[in-house]
Amino acid sequence: MPQERDPFPFPRYENDFTLTGRKEIQKLSDDKPTHLAQNDEPWRRLHNTTTEASSRRTVFHYDTTTPKDSLDIHLKAAYDHHLGLFQNKSQTVMQMETVGADNGTKKNKELEDSVCDAENKGIKVWVDTQKASLYSIKGSIESHHTASTNRGYSRKHDGGFYST
């Protein structure tokens, strides 16, 4: 076979290069390199303005209320042994700042409260006055496999067992 022959039949499929020709590489709008352009506005202002989280990560940050050792963590915890008995370790050292003390996020808290109040309008909460027994099958989802008999199978209406 001659080497000039195209092995792919017609119609030839078009792609990005054959349809519109070669595309130009997009040029940067600035002639400055990136490391020099970052010294101008708005880059400089964004870099120099600290947030609460970024200021805590700096070397010079010192918070007088932070616990210094394990004893301080346990003493400042929001855990009350009389109210929360048999909680796991992570719940016993939960700090007030994490639980919900005001730590400077006032705007987020106001938004949260307004959303919750708007969502809960018209919802009635019902609490059962009598605690139901764990072993009662009353009100359970009906199925032919329940633990209401010795073998774990329910009985048919005629007294026999269901089988699969």
Curated annotation (Swiss-Prot):
Composition bias, Basic and acidic residues: 155-164
Subcellular location: Cytoplasm, Cytoskeleton, Cilium axoneme; Cytoplasm; Cytoplasm, Cytoskeleton
Keywords: Cell projection, Cytoplasm, Cytoskeleton
Annotated InterPro entries: CFAP276
Record region (Disordered): 145-164
GO cellular component: axonemal microtubule; cytoplasm; cytoskeleton
Pfam families per record: DUF3695
Function summary: Microtubule inner protein (MIP) part of the dynein-decorated doublet microtubules (DMTs) in cilia axoneme, which is required for motile cilia beating. May play an important role for the maintenance of myelin-axon integrity. May affect intracellular Ca(2+) homeostasis.
Listed name of the protein: Protein CFAP276
Protein species of origin: Danio rerio
Gene that encodes the chain: cfap276
